[in-house]
């Protein structure tokens, strides 16, 4: 508390004063108001818990002094804002406008695209940006390396931009194909169940198909015939129906693939010889001379005339198997030749044929949609095979 003989003022009764223990004047300065050795109490001038109750402390000047607090009027002054000279310097300052390039980099204005690309061809410059082993464009001559940590990192990692682009494009395509394939697989797996429901509905015309599922050993509750448990007697019939449906789907896919290969001209089918019902027999079964020179697919069939020499006859470039089947069926069923004019007339796209097709679609369209609805997931697969094969 300093070097004087005063004591502290815990109750705040004598603000900015000291009290001599013996209530006698100090020899240095008898006036306690101007005593240079007194202690300063900043808390005495504040409004707080004093000797006369909470929130009231007599100020300097007497019991009830001259201030407003002494008269019982306590006012709270609002906090003053900081001056304008100081409150605008805090926070992020706006970025100044960059000077033009001709002022900051005058040497860059002397460069054009030709000079720039010629400079990049310099091995010393290329070595800085395309280190050996990391460049994706051409062969780079090695340059004397400077002891730089950054250059050593680039020499180990290489050029990251082309590699990342290739990796991204390399993964994105297979990922999309895998996602589309998984989606089609989930849809294809619903085909057997849909066809099984249609098959079993034929036995329950006018009502919901329900399998009683009664077994003498372990009776089960009523359920759908397409979801029989293994303990149900109808479980073996459900498995048999599913197996037949899978064979039917496989046969449908094989027929589509055969038609596609036949349309592309990839089936070396020998046409029937005029006046005969079968192709020639004998050891001469392969083509010795191609009918169209060097070709990727076989384009001729070898026959054996009476003189014993093999002769190659060209086969159609497309629809060879279809034409072979038509010729084979026409030889065995002569009445099929009567359908040729009708097929040609229908293929002529006459207005009558178009009206007939439109009427058939309008009349049988909804029923056909219900029948062909399970096979809709197969259409994208057939379309992709037709386009890419």
From Swiss-Prot:
Q: What is this protein called?
A: Large envelope protein
Q: Where is this region: Pre-S1?
A: 2-108
Question: Which segments does the topology annotation call Intravirion?
Answer: 2-242, 192-242, 359-364
Which parts pass through the membrane? 171-191, 243-263, 338-358, 365-387
Native organism is Gibbon hepatitis B virus subtype ayw3q (isolate Hope)
Q: What is the recorded function of this protein according to its Swiss-Prot or TrEMBL entry?
A: The large envelope protein exists in two topological conformations, one which is termed 'external' or Le-HBsAg and the other 'internal' or Li-HBsAg. In its external conformation the protein attaches the virus to cell receptors and thereby initiating infection. This interaction determines the species specificity and liver tropism. This attachment induces virion internalization predominantly through caveolin-mediated endocytosis. The large envelope protein also assures fusion between virion membrane and endosomal membrane.
Give one GO biological process term.
fusion of virus membrane with host endosome membrane
Q: Where is this region: Pre-S2?
A: 109-163
Per the record, GO CC terms?
membrane; viral envelope; virion membrane
Q: What InterPro entries does this protein map onto?
A: HBV_HBSAG
Heme in keyword set: no
Region of interest: Pre-S = 2-163
Looking at the record, which segments are called Disordered?
A: 79-99
| Compartments where found | Virion membrane
- State which gene encodes it: S
Q: Which UniProt keywords apply?
A: Acetylation, Caveolin-mediated endocytosis of virus by host, Fusion of virus membrane with host endosomal membrane, Fusion of virus membrane with host membrane, Glycoprotein, Host-virus interaction, Lipoprotein, Membrane, Myristate, Transmembrane, Transmembrane helix, Viral attachment to host cell, Viral envelope protein, Viral penetration into host cytoplasm, Virion, Virus endocytosis by host, Virus entry into host cell
What UniProt notes about the protein's domains is: The large envelope protein is synthesized with the pre-S region at the cytosolic side of the endoplasmic reticulum and, hence will be within the virion after budding. Therefore the pre-S region is not N-glycosylated. Later a post-translational translocation of N-terminal pre-S and TM1 domains occur in about 50% of proteins at the virion surface. These molecules change their topology by an unknown mechanism, resulting in exposure of pre-S region at virion surface.
